[in-house]
């Protein structure tokens, strides 16, 4: 799976997103705000595509705002996929779809961190210079598949289910509940991950112990800013059913591809994710928020 990309409280220096499964041009570009132009609003009943002049995102010609969170897209990103990402974010944050977020503390931290998602069509699209203090995540146009869930969770996976969840977890849960979802050693999440990996590995081991069920081996994925968030994604989406038909595709990283396997094998993460304090989503987003 693609390594989670995040902006970690960026200083004034230019920062570019990186991706473990693809080679993205690291050369920075300088951007300036653009004057909004006419943008087709789309046909979603809940979200409107708008032009913007937000600092640092000049190469992204439009955006959708979900509960105050910006989702930017370059011109080559299809409207249907931009709106799909917006609906997925809304469904993760308001999983019972009653019009109010399920965990206000998580959203508050996302807003405090000025969280954002950027949607790109080519690798060069994410050579950006966001303002200091923003946390972000990227999602590709071609890896977004609005029909994955509708088609019985078969066919090409919908990366929106992963990347949108990453920014919610990274900018929201990790800050709202550092003892539970913090990404450093000693949090409940990290402790559960250490069990799942068969030990506490600050760097990727040459091989994981027999019996480990989380075996991510990307050497660019560090313990505190990647491994924990990937682990959280695997566990939560497996509990929601996203991985039930994908074992052959994911077994090199994750073995517990069903809710039953997570519950019976990874009791620590199951207990954390079902703790009512955190009101984690239980229904897999399908991109049809309140429809």
Predicted segments, located by residue:
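Sec-dependent bacterial lipoprotein signal peptides
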Residues: 1-20
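A general structural signal for short secondary-structure junctions and capping/turn motifs
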Residues: 2-3, 107-111, 222-225
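Bacterial Sec-dependent N-terminal signal peptides
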Residues: 15-46, 291
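Catalytic-loop region of hydrolases
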Residues: 44-55
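Acidic/His-rich structured neighborhood in mature extracellular/periplasmic domains
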Residues: 59, 66-205
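Conserved aromatic-histidine-acidic binding/catalytic patches
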Residues: 73-80, 152-156, 217-229, 253-261
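Post-HExxH zinc-binding segment in Zn-dependent metallohydrolases
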Residues: 172-248
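Pan-zinc metallopeptidase signature
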Residues: 232-291
């Amino acid at each position: 799976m693609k390594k989670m990309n995040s902006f970690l409280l960026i200083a004034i220096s230019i920062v570019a997103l990186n991706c473990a499964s693809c080679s993205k041009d690291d050369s920075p570009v300088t951007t300036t705000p653009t004057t909004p132009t006419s943008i087709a609003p789309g046909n979603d009943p809940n979200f409107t595509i708008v032009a913007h002049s937000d600092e640092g995102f000049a190469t992204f010609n439009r955006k959708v705002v979900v509960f105050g969170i910006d989702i930017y897209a370059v011109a080559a990103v299809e409207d249907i996929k931009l709106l799909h990402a917006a609906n997925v974010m809304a469904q993760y944050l308001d999983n019972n779809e009653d019009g109010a977020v399920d965990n206000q503390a998580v959203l508050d931290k996302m807003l405090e961190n000025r969280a954002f998602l950027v949607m790109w069509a080519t690798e060069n699209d994410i050579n950006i210079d966001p303002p200091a203090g923003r946390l972000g995540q990227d999602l590709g146009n071609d890896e977004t598949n609005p029909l994955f869930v509708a088609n019985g969770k078969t066919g090409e996976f919908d990366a929106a289910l992963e990347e949108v969840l990453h920014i919610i977890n990274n900018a929201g849960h990790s800050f709202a509940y550092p003892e539970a979802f913090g990404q450093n050693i000693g949090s409940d999440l990290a402790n559960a991950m250490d069990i799942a990996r068969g030990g506490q590995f600050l760097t990727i081991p040459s091989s994981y112990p027999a019996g480990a069920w989380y075996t991510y081996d990307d050497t660019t994925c560090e313990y505190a800013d990647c491994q924990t968030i990937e682990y959280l994604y695997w566990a939560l989406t497996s509990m929601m059913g996203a991985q039930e038909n994908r074992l052959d595709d994911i077994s090199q990283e994750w073995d517990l591809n069903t809710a039953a396997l997570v519950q019976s094998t990874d009791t620590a993460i199951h207990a954390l994710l079902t703790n009512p304090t955190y009101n984690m989503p239980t229904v897999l987003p399908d991109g049809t928020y309140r429809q």
